[in-house]
A protein has these predicted regions:
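Active-site "cap" helix and flanking loop/linker of ATP-utilizing ligase/carboxylase catalytic domains
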Residues: 241-263, 280-352, 365
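A conserved helix-loop-beta module that forms one wall/lid of the active-site cleft
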Residues: 91-154
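Internal nucleotide-binding/catalytic subdomain
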Residues: 154-288
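Generic C-terminus detector
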Residues: 362-367, 371-418
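Short acidic-hydrophobic, aromatic-tinged amphipathic segments that line or gate anion-handling sites
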Residues: 43-51, 122-126, 158
Length: 418
């Protein structure tokens, strides 16, 4: 099977890296890819994820059997529908189902309509009624969410009415918003793989969304992640499956929204049980970078099962023994601003049994040097017998990634090691 991974981030590098090791995959390509995917597979730089004609040409020229869509934007724009019209199988939802991620108002309505566990919420499209509602809440902590795509940064948690109103007003100039009750508990990421009918579930992950140590600062796309999650035992996974995963897939089938691809369940484990915070309709970043090294099953075979409606005949397994921890190395100014084109002076050589360094949007200049693409530039992943060993190896690798302005959180996973 010849697979094209669409995208250029660290998630896509991890996908190319894992697929390249699959006996079910004869060639793996990345479009446009980055400096890392060009080492693990073959880049097609002419392919642009939002320029569908370039995807079609890349698929034709390289005889692609399956397209694995990495980022959310082309899914929201209907790339899977486009590929289906050409007879090319794809891992990802059609445009209608992609609204589970691209429209928080759509996904909240889906959850409420089907009686699925989620936070109570109100929807607003105008600033004045939103402000009146917020100021009537007596200063309780609330969560304001942009309805549309926001790269993980369209959320504010606060009890300050002025802050909430200002943030909401900035959203309402261009989009709708949801305001939700604030849920307390532990967050966990669950990924389901479906063939459009049946599904299997991967080991749990959790990510670290805040920019700075101690879970402080603004939200980001994610500054690190771990897999598995120490406090998620078999009993809790069984509860999540019974109360969330199975009912969600049943509701998707009932409404004609089930698809061949990935569904991410962003969950809050509250004293009253698991509640759904959000859906993504693709693998997460940085969760993918720790999940795939821990995946005992062959990813190529899982991809074939998803597009051939045979996921019930394969198993994703329970994951390999040990732990993985990922540390995102970001550029100066992230998440508020980004510097691009900085020369990377070192990327460490690592033993894959101990660590892996995934590139994000890096490029090679005319002299062969690696240049940053801004924002989150690398994910350094450590593997070990436990989280502490994985953290030690991840931070050793992260320290070896050097470029002007590079920075990273120093406490990824620490709260789970005490």
């Amino acid at each position: 099977m010849r697979v094209l991974v669409l995208g250029s981030g660290a998630r896509e590098h991890a996908l190319v890296w894992k697929l390249a090791a699959s006996p079910a995959v004869s060639r793996v390509f990345a479009g446009p890819g980055n400096a890392g995917t060009g080492e693990a597979g073959t880049n097609i730089p002419e392919v642009k994820p939002l320029a569908f004609d370039t995807i079609a040409e890349g698929c034709r020229a390289h005889r692609i059997d399956c397209v694995f869509v990495g980022p959310e934007a082309p899914l929201a724009e209907g790339v899977v529908d486009f590929l289906a019209s050409l007879g090319i199988p794809a891992i990802g939802p059609p445009r209608k189902a992609a609204q589970l991620e691209s429209s928080k108002t759509f996904s909240k309505a889906f959850l409420v309509r089907n009686g699925l566990p989620t936070a109570a919420a109100e929807e607003f499209s105008e600033a004045a009624p939103f402000e009146r509602w917020v100021r009537a809440q007596g200063g309780r902590r609330l969560v304001v969410k942009k309805s549309g795509l926001a790269a993980g940064k369209g959320v504010l948690e606060s009890e300050d009415p002025d802050q909430l109103v200002d943030f909401g007003a900035s959203i309402l100039r261009e989009d709708r918003l949801l305001v939700e009750e604030y849920l307390q508990g532990w967050e966990v990421s669950i990924f389901g793989l479906s063939d459009g009918r049946d599904f299997t579930v991967l080991p749990p992950c959790t990510d670290f969304k805040k920019a700075h140590d101690g879970d402080t600062g603004p939200n980001t796309g994610g500054m690190g992640s771990i897999c598995p999650v120490p406090w998620v035992d078999d009993a809790l996974m069984g509860d999540i499956r019974a109360r969330v995963v199975e009912p969600v897939y049943a509701a998707l089938r009932k409404e004609g929204l089930c698809y061949a691809g990935i569904l991410y369940f962003g969950l809050m484990i509250t004293p009253g049980g698991p509640k759904i915070l959000e859906f993504n309709v693709r693998f997460g970043d940085p969760e993918t970078q720790v999940l795939l090294p821990m995946l005992g099953a062959d990813l190529g075979s899982l991809c074939h099962a998803m597009i051939s409606r045979s996921i019930a005949r394969v198993s994703a397994g329970s994951g390999t023994a040990g732990a993985a921890l990922g540390v995102v190395v970001a550029s100066q100014g992230y998440p508020d601003s980004t510097e691009k084109g900085t020369l990377v002076t070192a990327v460490p050589s690592v033993r894959e049994a101990e660590s892996v360094v995934f590139h994000a949007s890096t490029t090679r200049d005319a002299g062969g040097g690696v240049r940053t693409g801004g924002g989150r530039c690398f994910t350094a992943v450590g593997l070990g017998k436990d989280l502490a060993q994985a953290a030690s190896r991840a931070y050793e690798a992260a320290a070896g990634v050097t470029f002007d302005g590079a920075w990273y959180r120093r406490d990824i996973g620490r709260k789970f090691m005490t």
